Amino acid sequence: MPAVKVKENEPFDVALRRFKRSCEKAGVLAEVRSREFYEKPTAERKRKAAAAVKRHAKKVQREQRRRERLY
């Protein structure tokens, strides 16, 4: 859990914003959402593999667009 030390004469809103940002960077909310319901190991592997395929296709598409601009 991220911790934020409140500085002297620092407004609460600013400290809260820093805390939210540190939680976002640490991935706390994403972790909570992923652990909200049990996911079978096979379903998790399948989801991660599908995400990897999607990322790869996106990368290939970006590379093709970049090559088209060069000519």
Curated annotation (Swiss-Prot):
It holds the Pfam family Ribosomal_S21. Keywords: Ribonucleoprotein, Ribosomal protein. GO terms for molecular function: structural constituent of ribosome. It comes from the Bacteria. One of its GO terms (cellular component) is ribonucleoprotein complex. Residues 60-71 have a biased composition (Basic and acidic residues). Residues 48-71 are annotated as: Disordered. Residues 48-59 have a biased composition (Basic residues). GO terms for biological process: translation. Gene3D superfamilies: Ribosomal protein S8 (1.20.5.1150). InterPro entries: Ribosomal_bS21, Ribosomal_bS21_CS, Ribosomal_bS21_sf. PROSITE patterns: RIBOSOMAL_S21 (PS01181). PANTHER family: MITOCHONDRIAL 28S RIBOSOMAL PROTEIN S21 (PTHR21109), SMALL RIBOSOMAL SUBUNIT PROTEIN BS21 (PTHR21109:SF22). Belongs to the bacterial ribosomal protein bS21 family. This is Small ribosomal subunit protein bS21. It comes from Pseudomonas aeruginosa (strain ATCC 15692 / DSM 22644 / CIP 104116 / JCM 14847 / LMG 12228 / 1C / PRS 101 / PAO1). The lineage of its organism: Bacteria, Pseudomonadati, Pseudomonadota, Gammaproteobacteria, Pseudomonadales.
